[in-house]
Amino acid sequence: MSSPLEKPQIIAHVQKSVNYTLFDCKWIPCSAKFVCVGNLARGSGVLQVYEIQQGEAKLLQETEKPKPIKCGTFGASSMQQRYLATGDFGGNLNIWNLEAPDTPVYSAKGHNEIINCIDGVGGVGIGDGAPEIVTGSRDGTVKVWDPRQKDTPVANMEPAAGEAKRDCWTVAFGNAYNEQERAVCAGYDNGDIKLFDLRNMSVRWETNIKNGVCSLEFDRKDIVMNKLVATSLEGKFHVFDMRTQHPTKGFASVSEKAHKSTVWQVRHLPQNRDVFMTSGGAGNLHLWKYEYPAQRSRKDSDGVDTGVAGSASLLQNVTLSTQPISSLDWSPDKKGLCVCTSFDQTVRVLIVTKLNRL
């Protein structure tokens, strides 16, 4: 990829200004539609559905909600229903039928404080086993919900009595390669990363990356854990090789100083798990490719398997805004199509070219 023209290009296809603070955006599976959620100036929440039509984002519907909506996922919904699960500033977990979004089809008082982050698995053809939703909150707890079970979570990971409650900023499902196995990874404001094994309800691994963890994502949710990317406040991200866990050293990792400011999000390309995008606090996007080492594990001096980290190379970067890009979502259906939101109250649909050449 010597010539600049051979590199992937990041093209702003559609820009749409809105009159509220945008917190999250998600493509609606199997459609040219996406949903945006956020906070109106008067303190209520808003849920909007847009459709791409002739190079424009056309607003199809808008619904106001009592509390600002912080995050959303389709990950626990079937392809037929495509229900959106959201977390709001009041600690409520709601599931919405976007065809009739006035009242939720499921509602639970999930947390005592704001739900910062949400993820889903077991739906939209991703991950074996039951559909589940995980939420993380400022109240320090991480809870796993089965949308078929009302009111009570199926798992609750909270600090032990006497331990300080840390603000949970990001959660991610992974390792859902059969009906029994499933893991949740959570990142906290003090730099802690904790990997919870949901099958035997234990903390499988924990580490600290010294700065608040803004975003976590496995490269795939529905395979044996392969890679995990964690982004942080000080412009760094870390890629952990999750295939080999050393008893004392944990997982091997490589870190990159990606941005000059907070790395708000990381999102892997659904069609190629070694390509991922990071979004920054200065309104920029960086597209990366992970290169594996010649050998992913080796024996240490005691003869124990230890992981070997690879490297991340920058493919392209672009500045779209002066404000942080707070959310980003790749289209699961159309390779290279993505939607992102920024605190400049603009939602942008982007096209990333030449991804099939990587």
Curated annotation (Swiss-Prot):
Pfam families: WD40. GO terms for molecular function: ubiquitin binding. GO terms for biological process: apoptotic process; axonemal dynein complex assembly. One of its GO terms (cellular component) is dynein axonemal particle. Keywords: Apoptosis, Cytoplasm, Repeat, WD repeat. InterPro entries: WD40/YVTN_repeat-like_dom_sf, WD40_repeat_dom_sf, WD40_rpt. WD repeats lie at residues 64-106, 116-155, 163-206, 208-250, 258-298, 320-358. Gene3D superfamilies: YVTN repeat-like/Quinoprotein amine dehydrogenase. SUPFAM superfamilies: WD40 repeat-like (SSF50978). It is found in: Dynein axonemal particle. Interacts with PIH1D1; the interaction associates DNAAF10 with the R2TP complex. Interacts with several dynein axonemal assembly factors. Key assembly factor specifically required for the stability of axonemal dynein heavy chains in cytoplasm. This is Dynein axonemal assembly factor 10. The gene is dnaaf10.
